[in-house]
Amino acid sequence: MSYIQILPETFSIISSLVLLLLGIVFNRRTINLLALGCTVITLIILILSAKDSGFFPFNSLLKLDLYIRSAQGLILIAGILVLLLLNLSKYDYEYEFSILILFTLFGMITLVSANNLISFYLSFELMSIPLYVLASFNKDSVYSCEAGVKYFTLSALSSCIMLYGMSLLYGYTGLVNFSELSSFLENHQMTYGIVFGLVLILIGLCFKLAIAPFHMWAPDVYQGAPTIVTAFFSTVPKAALVTFLIRFFMGEELVGVEKYFQPVLLYISALSVLISAFGALRQRNLKRLLAYSSIGHIGFILASLSIFTRMGTDSSLIYLVIYIITNIGLFSYFIQIDDDDCSVANLSGIGKKRPVLAFHLSILLFSMAGIPPLAGFFAKLFIFKSLVNSGFIGMSLIFIVASVISCYYYLSIIKAMYFDKPSDSKVIYSKSLFIVTSVASLINIVLFMCVEDLYSLIHLVTKSL
């Protein structure tokens, strides 16, 4: 076994453990900076050690190839952005906060490379357990404690469902290795027990993604958790789970399951965008609103993925990348607002007080809504094109209607910024965070000029599936 190939994972877990010990010596700000630095180093090592050919370390517990390394890179970049927001923000939590983020990042990068039901479940739990603590990290806030308890309770239920699905899959096949499962499913008739087991595993994944009808936890947890945690929840775990689902359905891991899963995935993705569109209409809390928004965006990604074509896969990844950039840009401002009072009213009148900031926030919101010629428009255009080319015209119309409805709540925020009276809330504006917001906004503006290049790059990565 070449130890160079597993150096990113090795460095990630060792650096997390070392920083956990160093927290006793150094102050929390230093640990936060070191956590950011270690994640950047992990990304650099990953880039330098990446290879096109497949590699199966630890007796095939993991699989490493170009697609998996690219997915891990996306996860680490999203994690770096959240850690950057943490270092630039008002938050002064205990040093364990950034360490928990490092542990969950390690769980995510091993999750997307898992090649065995056991390694997959262990990675899934290593990703999940720190998230429970992060959601309830603000002990002084009853909302944060409530969010942690709700998330833990429902996540435990979803983990049990997933574990039961894995036991069914093992019981009917006698296998746990993904490659061996693929060969078994290709050469044997699919029984209802196997299909039911796979459905239960999918339910567990859909819960973490907050896909309808397993979305009920998201609005309460997003609202109650510290805003920096909400920023993490809405981006990094979604990157990990979406990239794993792409490998799950489009790779060699599970062959022949498309006909069983396509109708289900299409229906729940349509349900997600409709619940998102109507559920967010009456929300005045920004974090609850973005929770419903994320349900809809993941619905778009899942719809494109459920087509089971290369174009659909590429479109879902483009959408994911643009969604992460836009979300980070929005949260770079929202984390400056009080965690327990993150309402739309706090944005009232900033179009007059801080016109440049309001402009950049408007660009990001327009992109979220899919207004041309911003990056969000092209992301949705690729999704619609994938659906139409595959013959799902009726489904495309549902998504178009949901997109039009969702424009209302994005525009209501812009209306508050420019036309409502300035609020009395005292927000301490950070110049550093303003730069993050501006960069995310500018990326959304200029990306339409090179969206084809991004598509070609993603297509090159997915060819290795």
Curated annotation (Swiss-Prot):
The chain crosses the membrane at residues 6-26, 30-50, 66-86, 98-118, 156-176, 194-214, 226-246, 261-281, 289-309, 317-337, 363-383, 391-411, 432-452. It is a multi-pass membrane protein. One of its GO terms (molecular function) is NADH:ubiquinone reductase (non-electrogenic) activity. GO terms for biological process: ATP synthesis coupled electron transport. It is an enzyme of class 7 (translocase). It comes from the Bacteria. GO terms for cellular component: plasma membrane. Its main location: membrane. Pfam families: Proton_antipo_M (PF00361). It is found in: Cell membrane. The keyword Nucleotide-binding does not apply. Keywords: Cell membrane, Membrane, NAD, Quinone, Translocase, Transmembrane, Transmembrane helix, Transport, Ubiquinone. It catalyses: a quinone + NADH + 5 H(+)(in) = a quinol + NAD(+) + 4 H(+)(out). Its EC number is 7.1.1.-. InterPro entries: NADH-Q_OxRdtase_suN/2, ND/Mrp_TM. Belongs to the complex I subunit 2 family. NDH-1 is composed of 14 different subunits. Subunits NuoA, H, J, K, L, M, N constitute the membrane sector of the complex. NDH-1 shuttles electrons from NADH, via FMN and iron-sulfur (Fe-S) centers, to quinones in the respiratory chain. The immediate electron acceptor for the enzyme in this species is believed to be ubiquinone. Couples the redox reaction to proton translocation (for every two electrons transferred, four hydrogen ions are translocated across the cytoplasmic membrane), and thus conserves the redox energy in a proton gradient. This is NADH-quinone oxidoreductase subunit N. It comes from Wolbachia sp. subsp. Brugia malayi (strain TRS). The gene is nuoN.
